[in-house]
Amino acid sequence: MKPVMALVGRANVGKSTLFNRLTRSRDALVADFAGLTRDRHYGNGKQGRHEYIVIDTGGFEPDVASGIYREMARQTQQAIAEADVVVFVVDVRAGVTAQDHDIAHYLRRAGKPCVLAANKAEGMQQDQGGKWAEFYELGLGTVHPVSAAHGQGIRSLVEMALEPLSPPDDGADAAARDLPDADGVDGVDGVDGADGRIIRLAVAGRPNVGKSTLINTWLGEERLVAFDTPGTTRDAITVPFERNGQRFELVDTAGLRRKGKVFAAVEKFSVVKTLQAIESAHVVLLLLDASQGVTEQDAHIAGYILESGRAVVLAVNKWDATDDYQRQLLERSIETRLAFLKFASLHRISAKKRQGLGPLWTAIVQAHKAATCKMSTPVLTRLLLEAVQFQSPQRQGLFRPKMRYAHQGGMNPPVIVIHGNGLEHVTDTYKRFLEGRFRKEFDLVGTPLRIELKTSHNPYVDEGRGGR
């Protein structure tokens, strides 16, 4: 499970600049949901071996009583509650303010692990007397100098914040992370894989689309047996169950609550919980509301599913409550706003009336099978050469890319690595053409497919030029 890091501090200390720096490795704003998280921005980042979710907050005034600043304070308090570690950002050039002391007092009472980041420290030495000493008066331990604008001290800041939350990293573990797991599932822990083994499933969607209704319908079916598994504080709640001989593990996104001997889901939307559930799932069922079409929030969640490389099934709930005109608008909305998920199957359901639910299970199993598909090098190479013979890549100047062979580079999602010469000139259009050929051959419905191009360089080219 990815740890969550919240950036907290008063206004104009550089939190957003630091947020952009921390998320730059994947260059994606994961969630900026109007209304729900107006003052909290969620991003996904990676520094070294650490992958994390980072939350950017507005300026924090813990004791403000009313108005918009009270709402900003409430949003920041929620971010602190969601976080595993807090990075308290201060402005080293402005020095410690009364507001900094108020925030530090609140953080000490909150009891969360906290790292003090002194921003705008470019060109400053930490032995410059009182300028640094005053920050130790905040009572939060070591002062860590950074420059978000220049990228200085960022890696060590992440190490300091996340190292206590990370498992031991020995050589064997590092090597294992570079290869697909033995069961064919890359990057998801505690799962068994395909062919009747456990499939970890997350039901994602914005509030009030019917996640809890759908989950409760599933958990209440006689053919579906649910049982409790205790988890740790930082793990998402999961409910193992079985349907038609296939074992599943439902990852909580709607808010599962224990009631006697059964689980019940209540509609409680949490951005962090949703992102973490997507990351830990094999397959994500993205639930849409037929009466509202595809919203910005839906598109944000869908984008994160794609970025995470998870298999996905689309389901439009409340289909029975729409007329023909609404359905036409919805179909167009899906085609335009979710065009990047055109590889996913689409199902029209009514969770309340239990309509259309049967095919969902088949689609979920098929999506997982596609995501963990094994593709042999001879077959991939044959398909590649046949595709090139059918349609060669476009010539770029004097050079035409030369594709030689292909092999599988990973699973969940499937990765196909193509080797050759001049492949940096291959266009995105041609990559989509190749993707279509591979998808058709291996029936890759419901899973992203990543194609990596690796150019072989002639070591004698530069030597020959140098001798002229």
Swiss-Prot record:
Task: Show where the EngA-type G domain sits.
Answer: 3-169, 199-372
PANTHER family under this entry?
Answer: GTPASE DER
Q: What is this protein called?
A: GTPase Der
The chain positions of domain KH-like read: 373-457
Gene Ontology MF terms: GTP binding; ribosome binding
The protein's assembly and partners: Associates with the 50S ribosomal subunit.
Under the heading InterPro entries, the entry gives: G_ENGA, GTP-bd, GTPase_Der, KH_dom-like, KH_dom-like_a/b, P-loop_NTPase, Small_GTP-bd
Q: Which GO terms describe its biological process?
A: ribosome biogenesis
Tell whether Hydrolase is among the UniProt keywords: no
What is the superkingdom listed in this entry's lineage?
A: Bacteria
Q: Which family does it belong to?
A: Belongs to the TRAFAC class TrmE-Era-EngA-EngB-Septin-like GTPase superfamily. EngA (Der) GTPase family.
